[in-house]
């Protein structure tokens, strides 16, 4: 019982700032949310560049060098064409190219088509390797040999 009380005293002592009983408990310091301040700075900078909103954009896809795609569904897009600046607002999701294939084919450029071909070839090779691995699991029996006698 006294062991439990000692543990409680240690825990209580770490939560107090001062030494005495009348001192207030320590308050947890929290990091401020900076996204609102950063967003305001970004909006001010974009306003200086004179961006204009672009309406009726259903989706935005950004192709990465590793073959994945950053997909924005129903984003807000602002653009300043003379400054070659585009701002995309929304929740971006990392997706593989194969997840978006039926609807994304008309958006693919020559580089992306090449990566899609490589992806298809690697997928076919993986299928072949899996079949070969399944066949290699069971060894072939050799006629005339008794493996049980070697174990003993």
UniProtKB/Swiss-Prot annotation:
Gene3D superfamilies reported for this sequence: Nascent polypeptide-associated complex domain
SMART domains, A to Z: NAC (SM01407)
Chain residue ranges for the region called Disordered: 19-39, 125-152
Coiled coil segments of this chain: none
Keywords in alphabetical order: Cytoplasm, Nucleus, Protein transport, Repressor, Transcription, Transcription regulation, Transport
Basic residues: bias regions: 23-32
Cellular component annotations (GO), alphabetically ordered: cytosol; nascent polypeptide-associated complex; nucleus
Domain NAC-A/B: 36-101
Gene Ontology terms describing biological process: protein transport
Subcellular location: Cytoplasm; Nucleus
InterPro entries the UniProt entry points to: BTF3, NAC_A/B_dom_sf, Nas_poly-pep-assoc_cplx_dom
Family of this protein: Belongs to the NAC-beta family.
Subunit organization: Part of the nascent polypeptide-associated complex (NAC), consisting of npc-1/egd2 and npc-2/egd1. NAC associates with ribosomes via npc-2/egd1.
Function description: Component of the nascent polypeptide-associated complex (NAC), a dynamic component of the ribosomal exit tunnel, protecting the emerging polypeptides from interaction with other cytoplasmic proteins to ensure appropriate nascent protein targeting. The NAC complex also promotes mitochondrial protein import by enhancing productive ribosome interactions with the outer mitochondrial membrane and blocks the inappropriate interaction of ribosomes translating non-secretory nascent polypeptides with translocation sites in the membrane of the endoplasmic reticulum.
Protein name according to UniProt: Nascent polypeptide-associated complex subunit beta
Native organism: Neurospora crassa (strain ATCC 24698 / 74-OR23-1A / CBS 708.71 / DSM 1257 / FGSC 987)
């Amino acid at each position: 019982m006294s062991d439990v009380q000692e543990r409680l005293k240690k825990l209580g002592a770490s939560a107090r700032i001062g030494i005495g009983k009348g001192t207030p408990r320590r308050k947890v310091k929290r990091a401020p949310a900076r996204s609102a301040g950063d967003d305001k700075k970004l909006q001010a900078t974009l306003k200086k560049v004179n961006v204009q909103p672009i309406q009726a954009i259903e989706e935005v896809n950004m192709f990465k060098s590793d073959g994945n795609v950053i997909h924005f569904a129903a984003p807000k897009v602002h653009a300043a064409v003379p400054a070659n600046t585009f701002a995309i607002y929304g929740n971006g999701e990392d997706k593989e190219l194969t997840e978006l294939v039926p609807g994304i084919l008309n958006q693919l450029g020559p580089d992306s088509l090449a990566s899609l071909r490589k992806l298809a070839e690697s997928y076919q090779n993986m299928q072949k390797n899996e079949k070969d691995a399944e066949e290699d699991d069971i060894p072939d029996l050799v006629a005339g040999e008794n493996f049980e006698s070697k174990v003993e």
